[in-house]
């Protein structure tokens, strides 16, 4: 255990010498303090305490007005994703059968086929159209049912939460969303140099010359960076929690439920940039791949899923969009959905989306295993 902790400590010392990591710590600290100071408690004419912006905010436009919408949209979105997938697929299949029937009928008419040939095709098209319209009505009814169920959940939960508590939860949830972007962007750049710096000539020679197993070196470097990130994140959460608690009197412990989701996202990104750093020994390439993976790929996957849903509910069907959407959903971890999960945890919305956790865990284990195997094979 001693050598492992020594590697962890060495990673911490390396971080203190990195300008990027220090900038990340500074940005997290500045944001945490600013987020506390940017809000204030006001009293409405009827004596209700609400949370508003510190500058330009009025008691009539408190943050609590967004609580119902955020809670409902998060709840209905997660439920719709699970309950509508099957009916949407059935509707899509019915649409494809209707299209094929229409094509066969058009072809028969173009060839001026005999009536006894066209009549069965017309009957087939009519049946396919009726089937599609039935499945479409069933889907629309299910969409309304999901929306109504989410509204009932909001109506049941809302009376037990004061306006001020709602405002604090919304403010915390929004802060988590922004903090995720700040920390992920900064951490990619900060951790990208850990392994390339260790593998540089001289540094790694000293390590492997000591009685330290390579698995201890590898995990020590990885865990060291991740623990340091977690400590900085915990400090930021602590500042926001204490600051908002003292300013508002609302101590929302559920706020900390977002932390494990953020740490998991950071662990996954760190595993990727570490993998690139081990294979290429290039900090710059690790940073570039990390940003491409987190930003460009994430927006591409999210865009495909939104496009597929919009087309499906609008009555337009493109098979290739559906295939790409479903394939990308299970091929890549959904950082956007993890971010939504973190916000849902703050609002205490009773939803759990296992897909990004399952896919992300698979990626994490694969990257760490293959990265370590390559690191073990390196000849120093």
Which sequence ranges carry the predicted segments?
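Membrane-interface helix starts
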Residues: 12-27
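Short cytoplasmic-facing helical segments at TM-TM junctions of multi-pass membrane proteins
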Residues: 203-207
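Short cytosolic juxtamembrane segments of multi-pass membrane proteins
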Residues: 376-380
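Secretory targeting signals
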Residues: 26, 30-47, 54-63, 68, ...
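Terminal transmembrane helical anchor/hairpin motif
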Residues: 39-64, 68-116, 123, 129-130, ...
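Amphipathic alpha-helical interaction/coupling elements
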Residues: 7-11
């Amino acid at each position: 255990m001693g050598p492992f902790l020594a590697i962890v400590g060495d990673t911490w010392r390396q971080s203190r010498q990195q300008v990027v990591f220090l900038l990340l710590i500074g940005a997290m600290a500045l944001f945490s303090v600013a987020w506390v100071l940017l809000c204030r408690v006001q009293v409405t004419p009827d004596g209700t305490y609400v949370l508003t912006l510190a500058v330009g905010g009025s008691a009539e436009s408190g943050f609590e007005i967004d609580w119902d919408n955020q809670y409902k949209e998060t709840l209905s979105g997660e439920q719709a994703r699970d309950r509508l997938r099957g009916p949407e697929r059935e509707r899509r299949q019915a649409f494809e059968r209707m299209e094929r029937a229409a094509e066969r009928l058009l072809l028969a008419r173009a060839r001026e086929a005999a009536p006894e040939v066209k009549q069965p095709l017309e009957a087939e098209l009519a049946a396919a159209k009726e089937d599609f319209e039935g499945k479409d009505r069933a889907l629309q009814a299910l969409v309304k049912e999901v929306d109504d169920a989410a509204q009932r959940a909001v109506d049941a939960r809302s009376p037990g939460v004061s306006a001020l508590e709602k405002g604090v939860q919304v403010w915390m949830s929004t802060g988590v969303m922004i903090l995720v972007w700040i920390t992920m962007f900064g951490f990619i750049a900060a951790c990208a140099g850990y392994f390339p710096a260790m593998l540089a000539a001289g540094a790694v020679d000293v390590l492997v010359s000591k009685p330290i197993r390579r698995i201890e070196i590898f995990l020590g470097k990885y865990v060291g960076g991740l623990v340091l990130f977690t400590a900085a994140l915990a400090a930021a959460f602590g500042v926001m929690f204490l600051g908002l608690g003292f300013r508002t009197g609302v101590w929302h412990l559920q706020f900390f439920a977002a932390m494990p989701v953020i740490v998991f996202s950071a662990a996954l990104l760190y595993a990727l940039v570490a993998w690139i750093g081990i294979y290429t020994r290039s900090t710059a390439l690790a940073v570039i791949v990390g940003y491409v993976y987190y930003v460009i790929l994430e927006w591409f996957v999210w865009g495909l899923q939104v496009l597929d849903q919009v087309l499906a509910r609008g009555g337009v069907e493109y098979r290739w969009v559906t295939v790409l959407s479903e394939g990308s959903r299970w091929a890549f971890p959904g950082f956007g959905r993890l971010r939504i999960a973190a916000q849902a945890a703050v609002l205490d919305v009773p939803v759990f989306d296992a897909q990004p956790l399952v896919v992300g865990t698979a990626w994490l284990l694969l990257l760490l295993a293959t990265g370590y195997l390559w690191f073990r094979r390196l000849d120093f």
